[in-house]
């Protein structure tokens, strides 16, 4: 049972009307976590009822819960092992950030929920401070995030592009040559320059914030490879506190060092703070139109862009990218070992391992594992003046602090102080990302190494949805490879997503799917199981659920099979007769059927079973019984 993390907190925040971290601190972490604890077991009985009725085997009696002390202690032990291997570090990175949940997300979380949306598309004029080529010019930059303009720090161009100086009415501007007529049909091109000629030119910022950065080399033109001539203007407004590419671009000329903080004038809820007083308290998305209005004549074009954009997988709200401090597991340096381990896994279908998972591993980044939240396993790091003590067990914390420790949620360990060499060490505030907990599950479910020293590594078999190639499969694979240099599992069946009959995601709000229990009670659990196991979903392909399809299984396979059983019950002495050639034929057919099933099952290939069974029952019912 996964019981921690943002999903639980988000439900509590909605129920209690909590709008930010301040509300939680005012309420008290102890009381807040008590509320979280109340709801995590809410649907346990309903879940057990459906699973048991489906005939799916799950060991409910010995199930693990991520909120249990034993599970959390194993996570501490695993983290300490990673920490002592030098596989953990703290850094400042531009991360996907959920303003609704007030926490950064990992890159694979951000990739889970993309939507087609429209955003503002504007062209902004940035006047150069000195004449260029004899003209008083303005650079024309394109952006779809007007809210980042108050924290503008530089202009980026591509030094290999050709740029055009053009006149628009009585003013002069410069942008990539081939993009001028896309936006300005009446523009008059005067001359052309190479991109490298624009480098280091000073320009005015759109808002007069952070002007003291000018003496450090900001508010100038720099090169970036990612600047495109396919869309936009070939001129990019750079806000390194809110863009990963922007941040990297500022490290190239040495303006900033890696992990250095830069202007990021937002609070944890995505609202402007006192650094930008004109928009203080406004959420970034709400501020777009106000910023466009205040820029006035600096806006040369205003329209809409339709594109795919990441949303928070839990709150379903747009993510932003924000420079935040975070704790990371070093994954990038482990890519060769991750790929080697992956090559030993039998993936079903094979293409998932050879392409989807392999490609994801090849581009893996260091893994953000800390969250600025409350209901989760606390990261066991105590710090003092840049020095850290990493704790790997409850006994170790009790021994070093002199306090008896029972539960290790935040409300019980945040005030624990470790005194060493006359200095007081206090715990950092972050908790683990719940995906880190999921990756630790194979060890923590057994309370390894405290009550169990057998890791059962690698596991024989694992199964989950195709989305877990960037989730659970990935986190288990990373932790096992980095920690123990072995793959976590031998065989992996990857299923697709079951969609509603209208091809949309199943939604309680839309009521676009039948109650599973109603389907089972109407057609039988076997009908539903056989329908699913014979569908494309067991080969990692999506499928649209059809209640009629379940009924068809009942009609074509199970009812004929039940009729066969009924027939034999009416002929109790049939086996006493001498064996005929028809008997030999049906026994041979049965043997062939069994061999096909064994062959496919040994390879974890499930999809053919329904076809084999239907064919055999047809032979049994329509030929053997009728003609014998």
Swiss-Prot record:
Q: Which InterPro entries match?
A: aa-tRNA-synth_Ia, Ile-tRNA-ligase, Ile-tRNA-ligase_type2, Rossmann-like_a/b/a_fold, tRNAsynth_Ia_anticodon-bd, Val/Leu/Ile-tRNA-synth_edit
The UniProt entry's GO biological process terms, in alphabetical order, are: isoleucyl-tRNA aminoacylation
The record ties this protein, via Pfam families, to: tRNA-synt_1
Alphabetically, the GO molecular function entries are: aminoacyl-tRNA deacylase activity; ATP binding; isoleucine-tRNA ligase activity
* Broad EC category: ligase
Name the domain of life this protein comes from.
Answer: Eukaryota
Family statement? Belongs to the class-I aminoacyl-tRNA synthetase family.
Q: What is this protein called?
A: Isoleucine--tRNA ligase
Q: Which organism is it from?
A: Antonospora locustae
